[in-house]
């Protein structure tokens, strides 16, 4: 799941996962 989230763009992940962009950015950065 982590790899799939990293591959998807932050904006798309927000809509799919429903998590705020800030949290998504932190995940991608890490």
Curated annotation (Swiss-Prot):
Keywords attached to this entry: Membrane, Mitochondrion, Mitochondrion inner membrane, NAD, Oxidoreductase, Translocase, Ubiquinone
Subcellular location: Mitochondrion inner membrane
Domain of life the protein comes from: Eukaryota
Keyword tRNA processing attributed: no
Chemical reaction(s) catalysed: a ubiquinone + NADH + 5 H(+)(in) = a ubiquinol + NAD(+) + 4 H(+)(out)
Principal location class: mitochondrion
EC number: 7.1.1.2
Gene Ontology molecular-function annotations: NADH dehydrogenase (ubiquinone) activity
Oligomer and partners: Complex I is composed of about 45 different subunits.
Role noted for this protein: Transfer of electrons from NADH to the respiratory chain. The immediate electron acceptor for the enzyme is believed to be ubiquinone.
Record protein name field: NADH-ubiquinone oxidoreductase 18 kDa subunit
Taxonomic classification: Eukaryota, Viridiplantae, Streptophyta, Embryophyta, Tracheophyta
């Amino acid at each position: 799941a982590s790899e799939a989230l990293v591959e998807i763009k932050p904006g798309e992940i927000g809509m799919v996962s429903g998590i705020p962009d800030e949290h998504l950015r932190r995940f991608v950065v890490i």
